[in-house]
Amino acid sequence: MIFSTLEHILTHISFSIVCIVITIHLITLLIDEIIKLNNSSEKGMIATFLCITVLLVTRCIYSGHLPLSDLYESLIFLSWSLSFIHIVPYFKKNKSHLSTITASSVIFTQGFATSGLLTEIHQSAILVPALQSEWLIMHVSMMILGYAALLCGSLLSVALLVLTFRKNRNLLCKKNPLLLKLTEEFSFGEIQYINEINNIFGNASFFSDNNYYRSQLIQQLDYWSYRVISLGFIFLTIGILSGAVWANEAWGSYWNWDPKETWAFITWIVFAVYLHTRTNTNLQVENSAIVASMGFLIIWICYFGVNLLGIGLHTYGSFTLTSN
């Protein structure tokens, strides 16, 4: 009873703090001069990380196993992973644009985990025999860490695409204001093509101060997106391989083409394509960003969408799971 009450308190404290943090982030995005608020938001995320850490430890103590056995616990661990990714640049004194994305991701996952949709599986249950293995820690933790990193990297790529489109659109409109309304009908590739033609014929200077800042921001987004996705890809690979070994021990086969396994493989393929296009110097940065943006949807289908089906070998922790 005490552990359950403590867990309930920590869950809502962490959610409340992260709500305040995301509000501060939105304010600092509008007013860059408020440095104290920015520092407060970073300290708030550290407090959120500590609350979620204590929450996981508490649940581990009274359940007798690492809290990774169902959808609720995996969502809490996903929030912890996103919080960890958020505070790493802070301790390295390296300011990045990852913070706004990770903070918003934490509030989404933490909010959903504490919502009424998962009420049936908030209480810890005894592990089914198939999950009573040392591979549970290795496989699930690597997969969740991989999901967290890939989600953050994918969102950075989405932001990169938005900024690139706006930059190309603004450049085109500055060179010919009459095309302001027409650009809304152009595709991303068409706008880039028109900008290249305008540059060939020697129009006005390519970069204004605003466009220069935007170009620098795009480069930073690409830098962090590539590195975070690379880290997530490593975690995902380790998670899939450890899961295959565990499956062979539990079911006598390394691969069964279970829905979760199939979508995990699709996720791996998508981000392998991303890494290939990103390292290919003949391709533009936007090409790899488009692949990563597609990967964002694939991850949610793999992680969350398959649980809605309630079929296959990975049905533990779906909405139909109840406490024993």
UniProtKB/Swiss-Prot annotation:
Keywords: Chloroplast, Cytochrome c-type biogenesis, Membrane, Plastid, Thylakoid, Transmembrane, Transmembrane helix. GO terms for molecular function: heme binding. The keyword Membrane applies. It comes from the Eukaryota. One of its GO terms (cellular component) is plasma membrane. The chain crosses the membrane at residues 15-35, 44-64, 71-91, 98-118, 143-163, 228-248, 255-275, 289-309. One of its GO terms (biological process) is cytochrome complex assembly. InterPro entries: Cyt_c_assembly, Cyt_c_biogenesis_CcsA, Cyt_c_biogenesis_CcsA/CcmC. It is found in: Plastid, Chloroplast thylakoid membrane. Pfam families: Cytochrom_C_asm (PF01578). It is a multi-pass membrane protein. Required during biogenesis of c-type cytochromes (cytochrome c6 and cytochrome f) at the step of heme attachment. Belongs to the CcmF/CycK/Ccl1/NrfE/CcsA family. NCBIfam families: cytochr_II_ccsB (TIGR03144). May interact with Ccs1. This is Cytochrome c biogenesis protein CcsA. It comes from Daucus carota (Wild carrot).
